[in-house]
Swiss-Prot record:
Hydrolyzes ribosome-free peptidyl-tRNAs (with 1 or more amino acids incorporated), which drop off the ribosome during protein synthesis, or as a result of ribosome stalling. Catalyzes the release of premature peptidyl moieties from peptidyl-tRNA molecules trapped in stalled 50S ribosomal subunits, and thus maintains levels of free tRNAs and 50S ribosomes. It catalyses: an N-acyl-L-alpha-aminoacyl-tRNA + H2O = an N-acyl-L-amino acid + a tRNA + H(+). The record marks D91 as: Stabilizes the basic form of H active site to accept a proton. The active site is at H19 (proton acceptor). The gene is pth. This is Peptidyl-tRNA hydrolase. It is found in: Cytoplasm. GO terms for biological process: protein quality control for misfolded or incompletely synthesized proteins; rescue of stalled ribosome. It comes from Bacillus cytotoxicus (strain DSM 22905 / CIP 110041 / 391-98 / NVH 391-98).
C-alpha cells in the first residue's frame, strides 16, 4: 500500500494558490486514477484505489498547512504505512515555477507543513516531491506571495509540473524512489 500526500490549505479562498500546488497534484492523480477523495477522517480528505495492482491512498490534509502532520501520522499509523511507501508533495520557494526536485530525505527548508510532518513522524527520512513556485519579487511578503494565485503565464509551467509530478508518482508504483529520482531530477 502506498500513501501520496499533497500539502495545501483547505477552503475555496486557497484554491489555486501557490501554497496549494500539492493539493493540485493530488487532484490530478485522483482524476488520472479515478480515485474519489470522498472520505473525511484523520483530519483530511482522502480516497483509495488500485493502480497497476497496487493499493494507493491519496490524502489532502484539512488541518491548514502548519498542522499537516496531525493528519498524516494518524492515517499512516491506522493503515500501517511504512516510510518507504509514503511520498509528500509541496510547494518550494527555492525552485523556479514549474521545476520539480525529488528527494529521499531532508530538512523542512522553512516549509511549515513539512516541519509539522517531520515533528509528527519523528524523522526527516521520507520521500518528497518539491514543486517550484519561485520567490516573491518587488519586496512582496512571502506569506502574501504563497497565498496568492499563479498568473496565467505561470499556470502553463505549473500544469506541466503537476503532470510531471503525477508521472513520477505513477512510475514510483513500479520502481524504487531512487530510480524515479534519477529519471525526474534532470
Amino acid at each position: 500500500m502506498k500513501l501520496i500526500v499533497g500539502l495545501g490549505n483547505p477552503g475555496r479562498e486557497y484554491e489555486l494558490t501557490r501554497h496549494n500546488i500539492g493539493f493540485m497534484a493530488i487532484d490530478e492523480l485522483a482524476k488520472r486514477w479515478n480515485i474519489s477523495l470522498n472520505e473525511q477522517k484523520f483530519k483530511g480528505m482522502f480516497g483509495a484505489g488500485f493502480v497497476n495492482g497496487e493499493k494507493v491512498i491519496l490524502l489532502k490534509p484539512l488541518t491548514y498547512m502548519n498542522l499537516s502532520g496531525e493528519s498524516i501520522r494518524p492515517l499512516m499509523d491506522y493503515y500501517k504505512i511504512d516510510l518507504e511507501d509514503f511520498i509528500i508533495m509541496y510547494d518550494d520557494l527555492d525552485l523556479p515555477v514549474g521545476k520539480l526536485r525529488l528527494r529521499m530525505k531532508g530538512s523542512a527548508g522553512g516549509h511549515n507543513g513539512v516541519k509539522s510532518t517531520i515533528a509528527h513522524l519523528g524523522t526527516q527520512e521520507f520521500q518528497r516531491i518539491r514543486m517550484g513556485i519561485d520567490r516573491p519579487k518587488n519586496g512582496m511578503k512571502v506569506v502574501d506571495y504563497v497565498l496568492g494565485r499563479f498568473t496565467a503565464e505561470e499556470m502553463v509551467d505549473v500544469n506541466h509540473a503537476i503532470e510531471k509530478a503525477a508521472n513520477a508518482c505513477e512510475e514510483w508504483l513500479n520502481k524504487s524512489f531512487l530510480q524515479v529520482m534519477n529519471d525526474f531530477n534532470n
